[in-house]
Amino acid sequence: SCMKAAPMKEVSIRGQGSLAYPGLRTQGNLETLSGPNDATRGLTSLADTFEHVIEELLDEQQAIQPSKENKDADLYSTRVMLSSQVPLEPPLLFLLEEYKNYLDAANMSMRVRRHSDPARRGELSVCDSTSEWVTAAEKKTAVDMSGATVTVLEKVPVPKGQLKQYFYETKCSSKGYAKEGCRGIDKRYWNSQCRTTQSFVRALTMDNKKRVGWRFIRIDTSC
């Protein structure tokens, strides 16, 4: 999040959240289309197609999402994955959830949101961020909801063996405006800072008394 800009004379800086815009990759070739008008119609057709696909995926997600009465619902997290190998792409449910949250926050339909996409208008985010999968071996420890430091277990036992825990973390980029301040803030009059913020996710951990269990821990989730 970009820390709220404060006058140069002021010392305190307060935090302010920001929205993330997930990207969608399309497949297709427009070289066979003739002329700029055909190309425009082709892009519009592709956008309409993906709009319907996203709507269907969101409907399916809501249908299969565990109910509040289900005890396994506590284990549901879009940023944690159990897998035998490193995931190659961002979690699909995470992308869909971020996209839906933005639509709800902006009170927009998907069609209106698509035509007002900042990427289409050449806009840039206030703070640059990077996202990647992180293993429990790389995290080693984390802070739980009670403020205690716990050990993040690398492997989770399953009926047919073991799976590794992976966490999809987002943090401020070390390059660009992360150290120079928030993009769009006049540095002559205001101080600003991009800062990584955290959220809680469910993970298999062990406390200092060697008790193993599923706990909520803090991981980096936005900039």
Swiss-Prot record:
Task: Enumerate the GO terms in the molecular function aspect.
Answer: growth factor activity; nerve growth factor receptor binding
Compartment list: Secreted
Q: Tell me the Gene Ontology biological-process terms attached to this UniProt entry.
A: cell surface receptor protein tyrosine kinase signaling pathway; modulation of chemical synaptic transmission; negative regulation of neuron apoptotic process; nerve development; nerve growth factor signaling pathway; neuron projection morphogenesis
What Pfam families would the database entry show? NGF
Q: Cite a GO CC annotation.
A: dendrite
Q: Point out the glycosylated residues in this chain.
A: 107
The disulfides recorded in the entry are: 127-194, 172-223
Keyword list (alphabetical) reads: Cleavage on pair of basic residues, Disulfide bond, Glycoprotein, Growth factor, Secreted, Signal
* Keyword flag DNA-binding: no
Q: Which domain of life is it from?
A: Eukaryota
SUPFAM superfamilies attached to this UniProt entry: Cystine-knot cytokines
The signal peptide stretch is 1-5
Point out the propeptide residues: 6-114
What role is this protein assigned? Promotes the survival of neuronal populations that are all located either in the central nervous system or directly connected to it.
Family, per entry: Belongs to the NGF-beta family.
- Name assigned to this protein: Neurotrophic factor BDNF precursor form
